[in-house]
Structure formats: structure tokens, C-alpha cells
Design a protein with these regions (language model features):
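Canonical tetratricopeptide repeat
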Residues: 29, 62, 69, 103, ...
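Short coil turns that delineate tetratricopeptide repeat
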Residues: 21, 55, 95, 130, ...
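Residue-level detector of the short coil/turn that links helix A to helix B
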Residues: 4, 38, 78, 112-113, ...
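Position-specific recognition of the canonical hydrophobic site in helix A of tetratricopeptide repeat
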Residues: 1, 35, 68, 75, ...
Length: 216
């Protein structure tokens, strides 16, 4: 749907839920409209209210997306374990939900948790979309967290090659990985490139000044 229709969708779904409170689709579309408006609290409330009306007859595609977005929202609010539970539910309904697999794997890697599981989930995403820079970056970062630096370099280089938007995160990861592979000059070069895109990043400034990887 078009962005300008979001408020109309919210109003329609609110009315429809009064007449048919057991229809999961109304909670889904209302939640997604709130999400598109960046109204995350209202979106999360809509999704939480909708959980109770999910049945075995519900659309796996919709329910999977339902839990995926819910997981993203919960993680943004710092509710890590609730987010992981939502991602688990998402993957029960659709085991090959690539977006969920990537986000779940990346968040686990950032926390340094369940790295073997994260690697398995992330590998599915790069198998499905081998030129997706975001997915390649996630996989590279998981290998980095596993101290598999030479392997991680292979995938971060693929991520950098396919990164059409020149993400500061991917570029910074490239610098981190290069540094742990012993390539200090290229590490500093990538950190400097990342800083151009994210000039307020104090950790990047320290990395460049010290010419050293700093764990966050």
C-alpha cells in the first residue's frame, strides 16, 4: 500500500477489529501501518494483541512476518530475550524467512551468543542471496566473532564489493577484520572511509588515532 494510506488503514483496522476481533489480518495490517509511520509502541501493541488470535489455519507468510517485525521492534526497545522468542516463533512458521534469519543471527553475533547457531542461520541467507551485502556482512562478522579471521575476510570483501550504498557499518567491519588479519594499512583506510560516512562515531576516531581495533 502507499504511505499516505497508512492512517486510513489504521482507522479501518481499528473499526474492523470491533466487529471481528478474531481476524488476525486486522492486527497485522494495523501493526504494519503503525510501523511504517515509525510509531513503534502502537505497532508493538497491535502485534501483541494479535498473537492471541493466531490459529493453525492462519497464513504462515503473514504470521511469520508478524513475528519478524515484532522481534525487530522488541530488540529496538532493548527487550532482547522477548525479541529472540519472537524470532523463534517466526522461524517455526517459516523456517526460511531470510530477513529474520539475518537479523537474528546478527544480533546474536553482536552479543557473542550462540555463535554456532548464528553461523548456521546466516549461512542460509548468503546461500539464498549470495550478492546481498548486508547478509554477507553478517556472515563475515559472525566468523570474525568466532575468530575465523581469514574466512571472515573473504566474505567481508564480497560484502564491500556488493555494497552499493557504501554502508559505514560494513566498511567499519571491513577495517576491523583487516586489522585482525594483520593488514593495518587497509584497516585504517577502511576506518577512515567509514568515518566519512559516520563522522560522529567516537570509536572509529579512536581506532584511527591508535591504529588499533577496539572491541565495543
Amino acid at each position: 500500500w502507499d504511505a499516505q494510506d497508512d492512517q486510513r488503514i489504521i482507522d479501518l483496522c481499528r473499526t474492523a477489529r470491533q466487529y471481528n476481533p478474531d481476524e488476525m489480518a486486522f492486527y497485522y495490517y494495523q501493526g504494519m501501518a503503525f510501523y511504517r509511520q515509525d510509531n513503534h509502541d502502537e505497532a508493538l501493541e497491535a502485534f501483541r494483541n494479535g498473537i492471541s488470535v493466531i490459529t493453525q489455519e492462519s497464513s504462515p507468510e503473514i504470521v511469520s512476518t508478524f513475528y519478524e517485525v515484532m522481534g525487530d521492534l522488541l530488540h529496538q526497545k532493548g527487550l532482547k530475550h522477548e525479541a529472540y522468542a519472537a524470532y523463534d516463533s517466526c522461524l517455526q512458521w517459516k523456517p526460511n524467512n531470510i530477513g529474520c534469519l539475518n537479523n537474528y543471527a546478527y544480533y546474536l553475533s553482536v552479543e557473542g551468543e550462540q555463535l554456532e547457531r548464528a553461523e548456521q542461520m546466516s549461512h542460509k541467507t548468503i546461500t539464498a542471496e549470495p550478492t546481498n551485502a548486508t547478509y554477507l556482512d553478517t556472515y563475515a562478522w559472525i566468523l570474525f566473532m568466532q575468530k575465523r579471521y581469514s574466512e571472515s575476510r573473504i566474505y567481508i570483501e564480497q560484502a564491500l564489493q556488493n555494497d552499493s550504498v557504501h554502508s559505514s557499518v560494513i566498511t567499519e567491519h571491513g577495517g576491523d577484520i583487516y586489522f585482525l588479519c594483520g593488514d593495518v594499512d587497509n584497516a585504517v583506510r577502511l576506518w577512515q572511509e567509514a568515518l566519512e560516512k559516520d563522522p560522529a562515531n567516537k570509536v572509529l576516531i579512536r581506532k584511527i588515532k591508535r591504529k588499533k581495533y577496539i572491541k565495543q
